[in-house]
Amino acid sequence: NLCEELPDVDFHYALGVDLGFIDSTAFVVVGWSDSAPETYVLEVSKFTHLTSDDIGKKIKWLDGEYEFERIVADTGGLGKMVVEEMSKRFSLNILPAQKRAKHDHIELLNSDFKKGKLQIYDTEENQLLIDELELLEWDLNERTKGRFIERSDCENHACDAMLYVWRESLAFLHQSETFQPLLGSDEWYKAEEAKMEAAAEAKVVGDVGNWWEEHGPDPVYDEILN
């Protein structure tokens, strides 16, 4: 899911922000196009000890570079006051991040990773996000209680910013222009055979995965960087 080159298309841009002070404040820029189904993570940055003024200036500068269609930020806790202050002071339209059903949306995001519909532009600065994705795990103690909560000793700020802005991206509205084969045609039977083979392979992989889930770590974002 790492891409070395971006497609030559007209992108729509959006920004996700996860607010912090002692913890990192993370900024994640994504782009998508009307002509392709993929969403691309274009730019990632993280900073500690940023004031609301610092954050507002950073967002304003990024907006000048990308001309965002959407800007979303975590408004939990004091975040709502910070976002309202920045929006007024810097004339920004910052939307509250959608945070309900986080685990369900992480699963959907993982699905997009596995399908190749979510790509990360392979740059040095974006390694900040990749490191989080590779290390972030669910808290096993919470899992025994039936709750999906990330381990508190794992960084998740860039991941959260990505999740916020991915939920706002419109790439999922893209409809493929390829035609489905006619029912009963040779192409249809070939497609069905390929589906059956993929299902059989997935079962084998799933059996191995179940063993790993029982005996190994419990990653939040899995099988995404193949």
Give the residues covered by each predicted segment.
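ATPase catalytic-site recognition across NTP-hydrolyzing enzymes
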Residues: 1-17, 223
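Generic structural signal for hydrophobic core residues of well-folded globular domains
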Residues: 31, 137, 165-169
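Mg2+-dependent endonuclease catalytic cores in nucleic-acid-processing enzymes, primarily RNase H-like
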Residues: 35-147, 172, 189-226
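Acidic, Mg2+-coordinating catalytic module of metal-dependent nucleases/exonucleases
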Residues: 147-184
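Catalytic-loop motifs flanking and including active-site residues across diverse enzymes
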Residues: 23, 55, 157-161
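Short beta-strand scaffold segments in enzyme catalytic cores
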Residues: 25-30, 163
